[in-house]
C-alpha cells in the first residue's frame, strides 16, 4: 500500500512537471516560432483613416498602426518587411488571435479590465476618447440634445456601453444600431438611418466631411494596447518592453499620421 502511494505521488509529480514544462515551452514558443518562420503576422484594421486604411490603388494597408506593426517586426526579425498584415475588425480580431491566424493584434483595441482577463495587453501605445459625429443640419450641440437618437456603433466595441452610461447619467434615452465596420456607420449617417456615428475621436477625424462635425463631448478615455494571447507570457513581456523602449518612435509615428 505504501509502495502504491509512493508510485501515485511520483506520477502526480511527474504529470505536474510535464504540465509546467509544456506551459514554459508554450510561453517561449511564440517568439521563437516567429523567428523560425521569419515573419510576424499582425491583425490590423483596414477601414480606419490615419490608423490603418486600405489604399484602393495599391492594395496596401497604410497608417499609424501599420507602421507600429512594422516597427515590431523590425525589433523581432531585424527587417520591417518581414511582416504579413491580416485585416480585422472589432468582431473578428479576438477570434483570429485565439485560433492562431495572427501573432498579435494592433487594431485600436481598447484596454479594459474584462479584456485583460482574456488577453495580454501591452502598456498603451496611444490614448484617445469616444466622440460623436453628427450631421450639421441636425443642430446637435452635445449628447444632451440627443434624446431618443439612434446612434451607430461598431459591433463588439466598447462604445455602446460608454455612450449608454453617459446618456443615462444625464437622464436621456438613446438607441443603438450596430454595424460590422466604420464605413457602414458613416453610410448610415449620411443616409439618415442613424443620428450619430460614435467611436474614438481620432477615428472620427477620418470621416468628417463638409456636411458633418464632431461634437465637443468626450467620453471614457480609451487606451490602445498591442494584444497577444494569454498563454504567451514571454511574448507578451517582449511586446510590452517593445512599447516602452520605442515610446518616442511610436509618438513620432502618431504625429506623422496626424494623430
UniProtKB/Swiss-Prot annotation:
<dbReference type="InterPro" id="IPR051455">
    <property type="entry name" value="Bact_solute-bind_prot3"/>
</dbReference>
<keyword id="KW-0732">Signal</keyword>
<protein>
    <recommendedName>
        <fullName>Major cell-binding factor</fullName>
    </recommendedName>
</protein>
<dbReference type="GO" id="GO:0006865">
    <property type="term" value="P:amino acid transport"/>
</dbReference>
<dbReference type="Pfam" id="PF00497">
    <property type="entry name" value="SBP_bac_3"/>
</dbReference>
<dbReference type="InterPro" id="IPR018313">
    <property type="entry name" value="SBP_3_CS"/>
</dbReference>
<dbReference type="GO" id="GO:0030288">
    <property type="term" value="C:outer membrane-bounded periplasmic space"/>
</dbReference>
<dbReference type="InterPro" id="IPR001638">
    <property type="entry name" value="Solute-binding_3/MltF_N"/>
</dbReference>
<feature type="signal peptide">
    <location>
        <begin position="1"/>
        <end position="26"/>
    </location>
</feature>
<comment type="similarity">
    <text>Belongs to the bacterial solute-binding protein 3 family.</text>
</comment>
<dbReference type="GO" id="GO:0009986">
    <property type="term" value="C:cell surface"/>
</dbReference>
<comment type="function">
    <text>Common antigen and a major cell adherence molecule. Most probably involved, with PEB1C, in a binding-protein-dependent transport system for an amino acid. May be involved in binding to intestinal cells.</text>
</comment>
<keyword id="KW-0813">Transport</keyword>
<dbReference type="GO" id="GO:0005576">
    <property type="term" value="C:extracellular region"/>
</dbReference>
Amino acid at each position: 500500500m505504501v509502495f502504491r502511494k509512493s508510485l501515485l505521488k511520483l506520477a502526480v509529480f511527474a504529470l505536474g512537471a510535464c504540465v509546467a514544462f509544456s506551459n514554459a515551452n508554450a510561453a517561449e514558443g511564440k517568439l521563437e516560432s516567429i523567428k523560425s518562420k521569419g515573419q510576424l503576422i499582425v491583425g490590423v484594421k483596414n477601414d480606419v483613416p490615419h490608423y490603418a486604411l486600405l489604399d484602393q490603388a495599391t492594395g496596401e494597408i497604410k497608417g499609424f498602426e501599420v507602421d507600429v506593426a512594422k516597427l515590431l517586426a523590425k525589433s523581432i526579425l531585424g527587417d520591417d518587411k518581414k511582416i504579413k498584415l491580416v485585416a480585422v475588425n472589432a468582431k473578428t480580431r479576438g477570434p483570429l488571435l485565439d485560433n492562431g491566424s495572427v501573432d498579435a493584434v494592433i487594431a485600436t483595441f481598447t484596454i479594459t479590465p474584462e479584456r485583460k482577463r482574456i488577453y495580454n495587453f501591452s502598456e498603451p501605445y496611444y490614448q484617445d476618447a469616444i466622440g460623436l459625429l453628427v450631421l450639421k443640419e441636425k443642430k446637435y450641440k452635445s449628447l444632451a440634445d440627443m434624446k431618443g437618437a439612434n446612434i451607430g456603433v461598431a459591433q463588439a466595441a466598447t462604445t455602446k456601453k460608454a455612450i449608454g452610461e453617459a446618456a443615462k447619467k444625464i437622464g436621456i434615452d438613446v438607441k443603438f444600431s450596430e454595424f460590422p465596420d466604420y464605413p457602414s456607420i458613416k453610410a448610415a449617417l449620411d443616409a439618415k438611418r442613424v443620428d450619430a456615428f460614435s467611436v474614438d475621436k481620432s477615428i472620427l477625424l477620418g470621416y468628417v466631411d463638409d456636411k458633418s462635425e464632431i461634437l465637443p463631448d468626450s467620453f471614457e478615455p480609451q487606451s490602445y494596447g498591442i494584444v497577444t494571447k494569454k498563454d504567451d507570457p514571454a511574448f507578451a513581456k517582449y511586446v510590452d518592453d517593445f512599447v516602452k523602449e520605442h515610446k518616442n518612435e511610436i509618438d513620432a509615428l502618431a504625429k506623422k499620421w496626424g494623430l
